Amino acid sequence: MIDCLSNPSWINPQIDFLLLLQNIRIGHFDILDKFFLSITIFGEFWLPTLVCAITYWCIDFNAGLYLFSLAGLNSLITHFFKMLACVYRPWILSDKIHPSELAVPFAKGYSFPSGHSAMSSSVLGGTAYLLKHKKTICISLICLILLIGFSRLWLGVHTPQDVLCGLSIGLILIFAVNIIINWADKHPNRYLYLALAVNIFATLALIYINKFNEYRIDYINGELLVNPEKSIYITTVVYGYVLGLLNGCFLCRKFFPFNPKEIDVKSRILIGIAGGLIIAFGLKYIIAYIIMNKVKFSIAIPIMLTSGLFITLIYPIIFKYFDKVFKKNAK
């Protein structure tokens, strides 16, 4: 195990802070582990996807597009940074750190930056930005973001620098994506340029992490601490899913724009429930199965890409078509 003293000097105070939380957690408040583990779920990708999708399908198309752009770009950036930095988890940096046993199975791969912190600050922060005139909701969302970040520290699966960087990525994206979307809205063709730019970035990023990036290969008792090949695989298939989401959003905005408010309330509720069930009990487990079983790329990438496209392009086209048919028959 790599000792804390062998790490850069700025890591030591962070380890000390985690040890302080650990002493509190193990000594008196270990029962809070389950609470913080439930809180941290809000930073996982599938739940923000559900929030974005319900907004996109049923409430406000433009707001949903903004949130999906935040979630997608956040995922592309954080996964790329994780592969570049190759920072180990706290319990690898110091054998004094003992993370919550409940959280370890969900904290695989590299540590920096915190994906949960970045995702929550992007999507929940973006939601707060959209609802900035409703102070109570904004304050509640900001508190939830901070609580998610703190939960990663409490559980011992991230250092403060991981969390702070993740929160910063989300904060920067909130304003950057708003500027980009406002620019694209001035001419619909610009959404095609956005799609092209995202695809180019993702392609170059994947080429770099697959062919040129250098990875640490460290063993403890003959066991590889972090398997770079597995991390590369996960990043690649996640990129496929995210590209499906983003390309679907941009193509839908260009060629199939719709206003959920033009659909009657009952239909919107049915659309949200049906789509939500597909995400929660379908796509979520398909994606998990692909990653856990390391399905070969020739099968995994098309499935992941189609899954993303289904949420942001195919499903809206389907329910928009049937809405027109029902309205026509009603006349």
Model-derived features with residue positions:
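Generic structural signal for well-ordered secondary structure
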Residues: 32, 44-47, 70-74, 117
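Membrane-interface helix-loop-helix junctions at transmembrane boundaries of multi-pass membrane enzymes
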Residues: 62-64
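Alpha-helical transmembrane segments in multi-pass membrane proteins
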Residues: 66, 70, 74, 78, ...
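N-terminal transmembrane-helix/juxtamembrane module of multi-pass inner/ER membrane proteins
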Residues: 1-47, 79-109, 222-226, 233, ...
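Short glycine-rich, polar/acidic loop-and-turn segments at beta strand-coil junctions
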Residues: 55-57, 71, 85
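Membrane-embedded catalytic cores of phosphoryl/pyrophosphoryl-handling enzymes
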Residues: 51-52, 56-58, 75, 91-285
